[in-house]
């Protein structure tokens, strides 16, 4: 194979791997390595196929400046039409007991996916929002680069 063909092959593979299916939505918020305790990260989204169950996943990208092995969140979910709210307090593990990050990634940044709600059926089509607040002791939580929300349709 010539170098030109190999380059084209890598380009096609990269494009295929970087595409999200239409049944998946991902939104990330950049925190620049510091997450203020008073700052809620809000994710607004529309559900057009409430009949299909969804997995709601919280995405965390941390670096080696993160001083803890776990992370705690307060999650506020709101139905935009009815204004009905639910609040969850969550605790997730970011590191093994030996201090090794469990997330995947190259270099200092690791990405970890945390299951928030699995096989969740939204009550109806419409607009929703999920707000995430860090609930750690530190007012300025260092080492969190990005926080995100991934919503995927459950495959039958």
Where are the language model's segments positioned?
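C-terminal motif of bacterial Sec signal peptides marking the signal peptidase cleavage site
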Residues: 16-18
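Bacterial signal peptide processing site
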Residues: 20-23
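Post-signal peptide N-terminal segment of mature Sec-exported envelope proteins
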Residues: 27-48
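Post-signal-peptide N-terminal segment of Sec-exported extracytoplasmic proteins
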Residues: 41-68
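Noncatalytic modules at the cell exterior or secretory-pathway interfaces
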Residues: 51-58, 120-136
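Short acidic/polar inter-strand loop motif in beta-rich domains
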Residues: 63-65, 111-112, 121, 134-142
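Short coil-to-beta strand junction motifs in C2/discoidin
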Residues: 67-73, 143-146
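An anionic, turn-rich surface loop/hairpin at beta-sheet edges
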Residues: 90-121
């Amino acid at each position: 194979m010539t170098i030109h063909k190999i380059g084209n092959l890598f380009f096609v593979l990269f494009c295929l791997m970087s595409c999200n299916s239409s049944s998946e939505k991902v939104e990330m918020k950049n925190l620049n390595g510091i997450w203020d305790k008073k700052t809620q990260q809000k994710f607004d989204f529309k559900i057009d196929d409430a009949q299909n169950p969804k997995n709601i996943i919280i995405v965390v990208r941390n670096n080696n400046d993160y001083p803890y092995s776990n992370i705690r969140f307060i999650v506020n979910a709101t139905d935009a039409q009815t204004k009905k709210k639910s609040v969850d307090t969550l605790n997730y593990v970011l590191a093994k007991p030996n201090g090794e990050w469990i997330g995947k990634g190259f270099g200092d940044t690791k990405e970890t996916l945390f299951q928030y709600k699995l096989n969740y059926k939204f009550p109806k089509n419409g607009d929703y929002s999920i707000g995430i607040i860090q609930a750690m002791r530190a007012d300025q939580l260092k080492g969190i680069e990005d926080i995100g929300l991934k919503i995927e349709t459950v495959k039958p």
